[in-house]
Amino acid sequence: MNIHEYQAKAVLAKYGVPVPSGHAAFTPEEAVAKAKELGGPVWVVKAQIHAGGRGKAGGVKVVKSLDDVKKEATRLIGSTLVTHQTGPDGKEVNRLYIEDGSSISRELYLSILVDRATSRVSFIVSTEGGMDIEEVAKKTPEKILSFSVDPASGISGFHGRKVAYALGLEGDQVKQGVALIEKLYKAFVTEDMSMLEINPLVVTGEGNLLCLDAKVNFDSNALYRHKDIVELRDLTEEDPAEVEASKYDLNYIKLDGKIGCMVNGAGLAMATMDIIKLYGSEPANFLDVGGGATKEKVTAAFKIILSDPSVEGILVNIFGGIMRCDIIAEGVIAAAKEVSLSVPLVVRLEGTNVDLGKKIMAESGLPIISADNLADAAEKIVKAVKEAA
């Protein structure tokens, strides 16, 4: 789960992480009022969307008067911001963050993430922070360094010193860096984050470390332990279909293809998407119904797939272990009738009660194409979509 920058900074501030003073604003008038509270004389007006690259897209502006605060707030609120992370459609700006301006001596980069290859928490740092960090990663990857922390032993002073020296900090800044690393690590672990990015982490003109931006992603599987974090969720920033899927505990991710997929198990879902590409088409989504889907859950999954207007065909690929194939068949039939299915549907079932499941579909009176294996299913759905075009 993602949250906005201003929310991320509030979470980090609870752990003593140094962040600039600032306030969220939802109207130009509120932006001016919040700027007055901060006092100035320099403010930063920041668009709040769940995407990076805001600065280059005009979503972050430094201003030196209240009139300019209002001008930029008026320009941004209600506008659509297009960045390299939003895609061509962009994201609508519904809120701003009005922040104190800061004097900047150096811009650094620091992030923490879960390294699934090593099962450790990794720090990624660079002396080249700021808006061009992606270019740094592409052209001069040697300027980006990483260090890992064994979760069994946790963070120690030498980790902080290692990061501080890698960032080129000197004197009192090293002490600040060590303290900052320990605070960020504590926040990361305690709040069950999966990613924490500070870009830029700056050295101010006074020689202090300050987190000018913060991007946080939380492990969705651990949200039950953090009711306060769940309350920060902004559904307007998420795909409506993905929000609907989460209500039924479905793992759904929209893609750009035209063949909808409904599969049980992440591995089988990825294999299904791969074989669709192998047979010359593109998957429209990743959808894992899990191992304990009910008839209602399958019906909901079907509706979510068909809510995407680009879907021209559906492939259902189920291996019935915990899940029974007859339940899947009943759900598919109920959903097809409820939505008046008008696109080709190929169903491949295998496992528990597979014969009963196939019998239910065969006697449904619906034009459901049955497949014997994964390759057969992919070939049939790609062919059916082409013939229906």
Curated annotation (Swiss-Prot):
Pathway the protein acts in: Carbohydrate metabolism; tricarboxylic acid cycle; succinate from succinyl-CoA (ligase route): step 1/1
Co-factor note (free text): Binds 1 Mg(2+) ion per subunit.
Positions that bind substrate: 264, 321-323
Reaction it catalyzes: succinate + ATP + CoA = succinyl-CoA + ADP + phosphate; GTP + succinate + CoA = succinyl-CoA + GDP + phosphate
Cofactor(s) the protein needs: Mg(2+)
Positions with a binding annotation for ATP: 46, 53-55, 99, 102, 107
ATP-grasp domain sequence ranges: 9-244
Complex formation: Heterotetramer of two alpha and two beta subunits.
Role this protein plays: Succinyl-CoA synthetase functions in the citric acid cycle (TCA), coupling the hydrolysis of succinyl-CoA to the synthesis of either ATP or GTP and thus represents the only step of substrate-level phosphorylation in the TCA. The beta subunit provides nucleotide specificity of the enzyme and binds the substrate succinate, while the binding sites for coenzyme A and phosphate are found in the alpha subunit.
Protein name: Succinate--CoA ligase [ADP-forming] subunit beta
Native species: Parvibaculum lavamentivorans (strain DS-1 / DSM 13023 / NCIMB 13966)
UniProt gene name: sucC
